[in-house]
Every structure is written in C-alpha cells, then in structure tokens.
Amino acid sequence: MATYAAFKHVELYNVGKAKKRVLRAPGGGSSDIFGSDMPQTPRNVKNRMASNIFSADKDAAQKNNVRQGAHRFYFIGDAPRRGQKPVDSYSRLFGEPARPITPGKNHMKSSIPFGQNTNAAQQLLANNKGKYNGKSGSVSSASSSVSSSTENLKINVGNRSDGNPVTGEGYKAGGNDYIQPTAAMNGGNQVINKNRVPPGGYSSGLW
C-alpha cells in the first residue's frame, strides 16, 4: 500500500502563498501552472487590416520567390527589384543589343498654338496641311476666331433688309429682286396686315 505522502495534493505546499490567476487564455503569458519562469517573448500576431504597400514583410521575399517558380533563379531572401531588366540567355551570352536612342515625347505639351508667335503656328499648320475654320493655313487662336466672327457679322448685317426672319418674307432674294406680293383672289385688292401675331402668341417666349 502506498504511503500518504505519495498522494499529497500539490496545493498543500502552497497554503500560505497567493493563488496564481490565469489572466489570459490558455497558452498566454501567465498560464504557467508549474511556477517556472518562462522567457517572456511577445506574441507575433499578424494584423490583417494593416497595409503592406510601402514596406514588405520579412517573409515576403521568400514567399515571392517560391511563388514565381523554379525557372527564375533567385536566391532565397533575394527579392527581385522593381524596374530591373529581365536577363535572358541571349543577353547573358551576347550582351545587350545596341538600340538607337530615341528622344522621349513630352505628352504634357499642348499642340494648340497660343500667344503672339503666329509664324510658328502657320508653319505648324502648313506642315499638317489641314484645314481649320474652313480656311487652309489659318491660325486657330482666340483672337483670330473673334475677328472672323465679327467679320462675318459685318457681312451678314450688310446683306440684311427689312423682313420677317422666320418666314423669310420681305427679304431680297438676289441683287434687286424683290418678292412680289401675289394678287388677291377674285380680283380684289390684297389687304396687307402689318400687325401680325406670331405663332403661339406673344407670350410663347420666342418674341
């Protein structure tokens, strides 16, 4: 038969001491039930909401290399650099092919001529051989469009005479040709009504 000392409960030796409480879930820092000092290492919890756009993880290079496949010869921990030219077997054996240097196009520069430099604008239009505003080689700028519109107004004002702008009655058809009023039916005199009411009345917003 076993002695009583062999079956003593562990709590009998800790009668005068305060009970250790579990402050965290099992597996946490203070769940040591045997009283030995465990090394206090902080738990590595990954924040799922954190963005890693600007700084890569420690394991990102290793995961990236594994994901890219075995045909890419990277050492583990060697991340491929952004903007690095791909190295193929031809360039490794024979070197880079000599390419002619072409100047880069300035995409932010406008091709619309502005300002007082009309000679350069006309030269540009002559090179393009296009028609702008119905005239070949004309400068498409704010000042020229304003002057051409006022010129057109002067021409149109000179050709106008008294008449109805909606129906066209009373305008000159040609040089001195007037629209002749037709004789009234049944041989009576034609009555010219000068007080005409426009279609829809005066309150229609057109007059």
Curated annotation (Swiss-Prot):
Binds to all microtubule populations. Residues 136-149 have a biased composition (Low complexity). Keywords: Cytoplasm, Cytoskeleton, Microtubule, Nucleus, Phosphoprotein. Disulfide bonds: none annotated. One of its GO terms (biological process) is positive regulation of microtubule polymerization. It comes from the Eukaryota. Coiled coil: none annotated. The modification Phosphothreonine is found at T41, T102. Residues 129-174, 188-207 are annotated as: Disordered. Belongs to the MAP Jupiter family. One of its GO terms (cellular component) is microtubule. This is Microtubule-associated protein Jupiter. The modification Phosphoserine is found at S30, S111, S138, S149. Pfam families: JUPITER. It is found in: Nucleus; Cytoplasm; Cytoplasm, Cytoskeleton; Cytoplasm, Cytoskeleton, Spindle. It comes from Drosophila grimshawi (Hawaiian fruit fly). One of its GO terms (molecular function) is microtubule binding. Residues 150-164 have a biased composition (Polar residues). Its main location: nucleus.
